[in-house]
Amino acid sequence: YKDTRSGFTIIEVVLVLAIAGLIFLMVFIALPQLQRAQRDTQRRNDIIKLQSAIETFKGNNNGRLPAGKCDVPDSDDPKLGDFTASKDRDNSACRLIKEYMHDNNDASINTFTDPGGQTYDIVIEKYNDAFNAPNQMDHIMHVLTGATCDGELPMKSNNSRDFVIVYRLEGSGVYCHGNNG
């Protein structure tokens, strides 16, 4: 006796469902890692943008590096409230943000925010051996003058005009980027 009905057997259906389940599982495991890597890439690009702003600042200020700390208080509007609260500060770290890191159409808007929309704080200080790399995501970009990068960590440079930017990434440790390569 031969059955001529067309259709799938239960084994074929279960096999297709199992394969589909594996594909969905791989997507759900890989997607957060891809998103985290994408956010870290944006942070690296932000660090390069900050380096460029510092180089421009140096060029406009007789080779002097900016100094100080520009931490902005929390606000409901991370792009406007934080920057407005800090834009009138006189230290050169805040001037760096105000004059070199603003929106081209509106100088009162701080566009220097991380991929999550949180405003970056900037701490600019002379490197010393006691510096500890950030161990958590605190949205602080550490600019260390008189330093160069040794992998992920800064180290003392013989040139006082060298600087590095150190930031804790979300997925892959600490990122150290220097102006000397």
Residue locations for each model-derived region?
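Intrinsic disorder/low-complexity segments enriched in polar/small residues
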Residues: 1-3, 119, 137, 163
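N-terminal single-pass transmembrane signal-anchor helix
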Residues: 4-35, 39
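A generic fold-level signal
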Residues: 5, 42, 157-160
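Alpha-helix exit/C-cap motif
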Residues: 32, 52-73, 102-106
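Membrane-proximal amphipathic alpha-helices
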Residues: 36-50
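Acidic, glycine-rich loop-and-strand cores that form catalytic or ligand-binding grooves
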Residues: 68-148
